[in-house]
Structures are given as structure tokens and as C-alpha cells.
Amino acid sequence: MQLSSLSHTSITHKDKKKKMGIELQNHQSHHEEASPAEEPMSRWLINTPEPPSMWQELIGYIRTNVLAKKKHKRNKTKNSSSNLVYSCLKSAFPILSWGRQYKLNLFKKDLMAGLTLASLCIPQSIGYANLAGLDPEYGLYTSVVPPLIYSTMGTSRELAIGPVAVVSLLLSSMVRDLQDPVTDPIAYRKIVFTVTFFAGAFQAIFGLFRLGFLVDFLSHAALVGFMAGAAIVIGLQQLKGLFGLTHFTNKTDVVSVLSSVFHSLHHPWQPLNFVIGSSFLIFILLARFIGKRNNKLFWIPAMAPLISVVLATLIVYLSNAESRGVKIVKHIKPGFNQLSVNQLQFKSPHLGQIAKIGLISAIIALTEAIAVGRSFATIKGYRLDGNKEMMAMGFMNIAGSLSSCYVATGSFSRTAVNFSAGCETVVSNIVMAITVMISLEVLTRFLYFTPTAILASIILSALPGLIDVSGALHIWKLDKLDFLVLIAAFFGVLFASVEIGLLLAVGISFARIMLSSIRPSIEALGRLSKTDIFGDINQYPMANKTAGLLTLRISSPLLCFANANFIRDRILNSVQEIEGEENEQEVLKENGLQVVILDMSCVMGVDTSGVFALEELHQELASNDIRLVIASPRWRVLHKLKRAKLDEKIKTENIYMTVGEAVDIYVRARSTSHELC
């Protein structure tokens, strides 16, 4: 872009600009020759040392984050090796820290909470295992080992660990593409265990190397949309159990599921399944309504699923309803978790896809668990350690994969029950796990006659908690682009697949970040009266602009190849507009634009393209007798300018520590020039 064609001012006007420039330089030179006590702040800026190199930063990051150790008060004598080992163990296993202060009155509360939690966990675990395409006992296994591991390593006091609906659906939909659970359930189960191992490994790596920011790529809006879409898909999947359908699709999109239901209803089906399932669904929802109306009756909705299972099983057993077409769970293998080390498929031809499913499962499970844990930690007034949570989740899933468990995480519905039941520590998880372990040994024969319709009704009753309508409305009011991410995740899961919904949500989130980085705003600044504060003149219309000055702020944290040309053109366009106004208003010629001050306080980094753009901007402005002044450059930005010798081209006297300093020097020089005239 050329500005010279727009600067059709008189020779007198250009001479005045040149004279003003000389006066400003003379004023700056005089200021530089002042006594040390009056040394300008810009000198402090120019003489700053070099910032740490990339390698020094990397080493510093590893020292402070990866190899970080808590500072302990040191006595005159060095700590013994045993104390050091104990300190490391306490850091890895928080139970060693609070376990010493654990008292009987706390155990009474945790015992009641754990038993209440188990009453909800047992029927839900069986249902979620069915949703994941596994036999019922594997859901119960997942409610034993992972909670026990988490109770020693986790930092949340309320988080209830076990299988959850969303992760179960995720595994079912993605692993099914590699192996059909109907044709070869053993091969399917082996892949699920291997996915669980990779999920745990990724979670442990995230915690070990402080990579928790990766979980943040799934924004709150994306999570709300994903959960809502998954809840509807899960609900539609339960129509198979609720109606007792035999022919049903393996796909998860809403069109395929509804089409399958429509065609299946044309085949013979037994309405008794629907009667049993819908009756107990109404009972569970009614119990939940009572619990919400009176918090003291929290145990009613918590016990309702287990009561439903017991009653439905007795009804089916006593009435011989199986002979009338009611589908039942049938055989549940009794006994404790069996080792599954030899079932992990590390030599599978699908190992890459298995690892990918493990990564997606790890992120979804972590996001849900940390979100739930933090919300209840905030209520209780303590801080959740995100990195320790990742480590705990990782090791519990690795251990789970070796003991016939699939991916476990924190459940919102069970955590809410645990909280309402008055839990004080993670001992409630231990009580729950022991109770489930006993039920595996004692109750499996009784559960043989449990109707599948009751499991479907239990899962359906838990789904409303996954649909956050008020949260979606809040996002709509707050940020329309965030709502677009929510809608993309919701409809992607609903009409395509779980992975497509995730990809759409993450893709739109990235596109939004890229758009804001590539097309940042350039703000024109003015000074607020009687202050040294400079604000956007659009946000603060009362801000005063200084004649002959154009102060602009780059709002992007990076001046790089993606936005350098755009930023340069925007700045030149702003100058062009002012030059055009000067040509139209002859009165303003003697106060024409002489200096462009570029506030770079928001710019954290600059690359080669950014440096070239600044150099081109300087040359373009200089050809029109306009000086480029840089204010508030960050340490690394200034270092890059020095390395490129751009500070010599712009001249160091045109680099200032603050916008206020640059404006004040210009105003003083201008007043001096007028006095000389």
C-alpha cells in the first residue's frame, strides 16, 4: 500500500512536519543528555539484558513443573533417606497425609455414604456394562479396583469412581468398528481392555508432564453439547432393552436408531418388557422428585434403582415372566476381578486405532471427572490438584485394564449422591468398592432373573442430569460463537457419531482461536482526562486524542506470519483515513499527522514475518514524513527487534517504555516548537 498518493499537502505543510520532527529529535537528544537522575525510562528499556533462550526456558519448565518438589523446612541436619522416601510417598499417595487424622466420627459418615453409593452403583454398573457391549460383571469389576486405587491417590473427597454412561457409549460406538461384540465377544473384550490401558497411560502421562492444558481443548460449551447429544443417543439405545427388541442397529446416530426401532416394532415383541421398564422408570423419577423437594430424603432417590432391581427381579422370578417373553440378564459370573494381563492386545493390527480410542476416552473421562470434582471441591472450600487427579485416574485405569475393568471416571450422578449422603473423605469409595465386591460373591445368582428393561430404565433415569438446558441458554446469552460450538457437538453426536461430534466441536473451537489470532483488532487509543491511562476511544468516547498523534494498540498476543500483513495493512488504513481527513479539512494541515505510536504491550511474541512487517510499516510511514514510535514492547519482542537491528532503523529514541512517556515527550517537543516559531 502506498500512502504518498494520498499526501497531497502543500510544501509548507511538509516543511512544518520536517521541522516538527527535527524539534522532537532535538528534544529527545537534550533529554538523553540530562543527568542520571532525569534519565528517561526508555533507557531502562533499551538496556535490558537478553531474555532466556528457548533451551533455557525448556529446562526451567522441566525443573519447575515436571521435576517440581514441595519445599520442606530443612533442619541443620540433612533429612534422612527414609524421610525423603516418605515425603515422596505422601506426595504420590495423599491418603498417607490425611489418614493419620482420620477419626471414627468421619468413618460413620463415610460408611453411610459408601453404602448409599453402592446401592446406586450396583444397578448402574450392570446397565453401563451392557451399554458398553460387555457382560454385566465387567461393570461391577470396574466399580471395585479403580475406586480402591483412586482412594489412595486422588485429591477429591466426594468424587465417586466407576463406569459412566458417556464413556460406555464412546467405547461401544468406536470399538465396535474394530470388532463386533456379538460375533466375537472375547476379541471385543480384549480390545476394550487394551483401550483402557492406553487411556490410563495417556492420563498418567498428562499428569506426570503437567499436560493438563490438553484437556482444555474440549471447552465447556463443547462439553455441554457433547454430553447432551450423548445423553439422547444413550436414551435411544435403551429403547432396545425397554421394548425387549431383538433386531437392533449397531449404529449410534439418531436416524439409524429410530429407523431400527420403527422396523423392529413390526416384528413380534412382548409388551411386558415395556410395562416393567416404564413402571419402574416412573418410580425412580418420582423418588428423585421427592429427594429434590426434601434434601433430608436424599436416600430415597439413591436407593430407588436398587429397590427397583430387587422388586423387578422378584416379580420376574415368582411369576415366571421369562416364559412370557420378558428378557432377563441371565448368567453373571460370580467372584472377584480376574487378571486380564494376558488379554491385552499390543500386537493387534489395529493398535494405532486402539491407541486413538484410548486417547479420546482419556480426554473425555478426565474432562468429566475434573469438572465434577472441581465443582464439589468449590462447594466444600478446598482446592483440587488437577495434575494429581490425572495421575490417579491414569494409574487406576492402568490397574483396571489388568484386572478386567474398562475405562472408569468420576460420575456426576453418583458424586451428587455421595455428597448428599454426607461423605467426608474418599473412604466412601472404599466402602462402596467392598460392598460391590461382596455383591459379586453373593448376589450374582439372584441377579440372574433381573429384566433388561429395568436396567434400561435405570440408565434412562440418569440421563436428564447430562442435559444442561440452563447452561446452554447461559452460553447462548453470553457468547454466540461458543453456542455454535455447543450446537456442532450436539448435532454431530446426534446425527453422525460420537467422534464426529467431538471433531466438529474441537475443530470449530480451533477455527475460532485461529480467526481471532489471524484477524486481531487494532484499537485507536485516547488519554483519559487527568490520568496516564490510555483506552480504546470506542469503549471510552470521553478519551482525548492528541493532535498530530495516532496511538494504536495491537490486541493480538502474537505478531506472526499469520497476522503480520493484516496488522500492517490495518495500521496503514488508519493512517490513510487520517490523511484523507486532513486533505478535506484545510484547517488541520498545520496539525497534521506526524507520529504513529504503536502500543505493543499485548504482543508477547514476534517472528520473522512480524519483524519484516514492522520494518515495511516504518519505511512506508517514513516516506510520508511520519515517524513510527514503539511503546511498551515486551522483553522478548524487544530482543527480536534488536537481533533484527530494527531498533537502529527505527532509532532507539523512538522506543518507549510506556505510551504515556511517548505522548508526553511529543507534547513537550511540540510546545517547544511552537515557542520557537
Curated annotation (Swiss-Prot):
Gene3D superfamilies: STAS domain. One of its GO terms (biological process) is sulfate transmembrane transport. Residues 132-133, 180-190, 235-270, 318-352, 411-422, 468-482 are extracellular. It comes from the Eukaryota. The chain crosses the membrane at residues 111-131, 134-154, 159-179, 191-211, 214-234, 271-291, 297-317, 353-373, 390-410, 423-443, 447-467, 483-503. Induction: In leaves by sulfate starvation. Up-regulated after treatment with zeatin, an exogenous cytokinin. Residues 1-110, 155-158, 212-213, 292-296, 374-389, 444-446, 504-677 are cytoplasmic. GO terms for cellular component: membrane. It holds the Pfam family STAS. It is a multi-pass membrane protein. GO terms for molecular function: secondary active sulfate transmembrane transporter activity; sulfate transmembrane transporter activity; symporter activity. Expressed in the phloem in roots and in the phloem of vascular bundles in leaves. NCBIfam families: sulP. Low-affinity H(+)/sulfate cotransporter that may be involved in the distribution of sulfate from vascular bundles to the palisade cells of the leaves. Plays a central role in the regulation of sulfate assimilation. This is Sulfate transporter 2.2. It comes from Arabidopsis thaliana. The lineage of its organism: Eukaryota, Viridiplantae, Streptophyta, Embryophyta, Tracheophyta. The gene is SULTR2;2.
